[in-house]
Amino acid sequence: MAENGKNCDQRRVAMNKEHHNGNFTDPSSVNEKKRREREERQNIVLWRQPLITLQYFSLEILVILKEWTSKLWHRQSIVVSFLLLLAVLIATYYVEGVHQQYVQRIEKQFLLYAYWIGLGILSSVGLGTGLHTFLLYLGPHIASVTLAAYECNSVNFPEPPYPDQIICPDEEGTEGTISLWSIISKVRIEACMWGIGTAIGELPPYFMARAARLSGAEPDDEEYQEFEEMLEHAESAQDFASRAKLAVQKLVQKVGFFGILACASIPNPLFDLAGITCGHFLVPFWTFFGATLIGKAIIKMHIQKIFVIITFSKHIVEQMVAFIGAVPGIGPSLQKPFQEYLEAQRQKLHHKSEMGTPQGENWLSWMFEKLVVVMVCYFILSIINSMAQSYAKRIQQRLNSEEKTK
């Protein structure tokens, strides 16, 4: 692996020398031009240039569709096999018979797994910004299960409506029968699938860096370019962010599997750098993905689950509400909506929602719903901006290639 990396470095250095010698290009002017182009792309956002952003976004979609159509056309055998398999599955799904009970069971599990894996992928990939699906979906789900478990003294919620809606079973348990482990077991599938999704979402930086290293070509990805610049100026790094990135890079490079496992197991915003580092230094795929999967889907998820469950356990919640009420002056007015919300949730769990305050009238529920809407809208806007900037980068690359051929 070290020899491969050394050969790739030598090949890239040779290509850079040839490029500079052949075209008499000053490296400083090249870097300045790249900086200007990056600033131009960053200005292409909906709130600054809405018409151009929407135009470039639409054109980028057309380019991507054209590329995928071409790829599928050159893989006709795979496409035909997939369509035949899809036809068999559709026929099995709609044809009546004794197999329908198994089909419905498989469909339910498949949709559940796909939902949480998809949210995990969205949380990692983000296309420019992460949709924090743990804070918006998985965390609230674990909190709801925790509150319901302590209220019902059971985790055997009726299915259906669980997991879409949580209500207490007809035969509730006795006080004190709920343990931390029982709640962890109840939400294990959702949390594990979400963790698998986040691990899958970390693959693009790895594959991008690996392909750039093996080809010896100049990478197009800005994060990878920043990574190479960081390696070049490693000794002169002074600020905390640069030192933290270098620490992650050295940990992954020197420790290998267990270094990747450590980075994946601890919630941190620098794990993308671990994927780029592994790809750049040609770490084997299963070493990277195996460590990432174990770290994110098992270790990290259990840390996050335990934190949420403890935070929303019955006595902690009661203490937090009491603490809010003790705030001088505004305490009682702040405490009231929390008490109303918790009371409404208890009544819903016991099929008595019509007797309590409707959830829609509670400002806590209203604020959380609006927060979800705002974050999802921001995520969609970031995708539009990111794709528009990708098309702008295509234009810049085409113009640069035309200048070189003149």
From Swiss-Prot:
Q: What is this protein called?
A: Vacuole membrane protein 1
Gene Ontology annotations for the cellular component aspect, listed alphabetically: autophagosome membrane; endomembrane system; endoplasmic reticulum; endoplasmic reticulum membrane; endoplasmic reticulum-Golgi intermediate compartment membrane; membrane; nucleolus; phagophore assembly site
Q: Name one GO biological process term.
A: autophagosome membrane docking
Q: Which residues carry this modification: N-acetylalanine?
A: A2
Which residues fall in a compositionally biased region of kind Basic and acidic residues?
1-21
On the tree of life, the source organism's domain of life is Eukaryota
Described purpose of this protein according to its UniProt entry: Phospholipid scramblase involved in lipid homeostasis and membrane dynamics processes. Has phospholipid scramblase activity toward cholesterol and phosphatidylserine, as well as phosphatidylethanolamine and phosphatidylcholine. Required for autophagosome formation: participates in early stages of autophagosome biogenesis at the endoplasmic reticulum (ER) membrane by reequilibrating the leaflets of the ER as lipids are extracted by ATG2 (ATG2A or ATG2B) to mediate autophagosome assembly. Regulates ATP2A2 activity to control ER-isolation membrane contacts for autophagosome formation.
The record places the following residue ranges in the Cytoplasmic compartment, namely 2-43, 99-109, 272-273, 327-363
Region ranges (Disordered): 1-35
The record's subunit annotation is: Interacts with BECN1. Interacts with TJP1. Interacts with TP53INP2. Interacts with TMEM41B. Interacts with ATP2A2, PLN and SLN; competes with PLN and SLN to prevent them from forming an inhibitory complex with ATP2A2. Interacts with ATG2A.
Q: Which residues cross the membrane?
A: 44-64, 78-98, 110-130, 251-271, 274-294, 306-326, 364-384
Q: What is its main location?
A: endoplasmic reticulum
- Membrane topology per the record? Multi-pass membrane protein
UniProt family annotation: Belongs to the VMP1 family.
Q: Which keywords accompany this UniProt record?
A: Acetylation, Autophagy, Cell adhesion, Cell membrane, Endoplasmic reticulum, Lipid transport, Membrane, Transmembrane, Transmembrane helix, Transport, Vacuole
Q: Which reaction does it catalyse?
A: a 1,2-diacyl-sn-glycero-3-phospho-L-serine(in) = a 1,2-diacyl-sn-glycero-3-phospho-L-serine(out); cholesterol(in) = cholesterol(out); a 1,2-diacyl-sn-glycero-3-phosphocholine(in) = a 1,2-diacyl-sn-glycero-3-phosphocholine(out); a 1,2-diacyl-sn-glycero-3-phosphoethanolamine(in) = a 1,2-diacyl-sn-glycero-3-phosphoethanolamine(out)
- In the UniProt record, the gene name given for this protein reads VMP1
Question: Result of mutating G197R?
Answer: Decreases interaction with ATP2A2
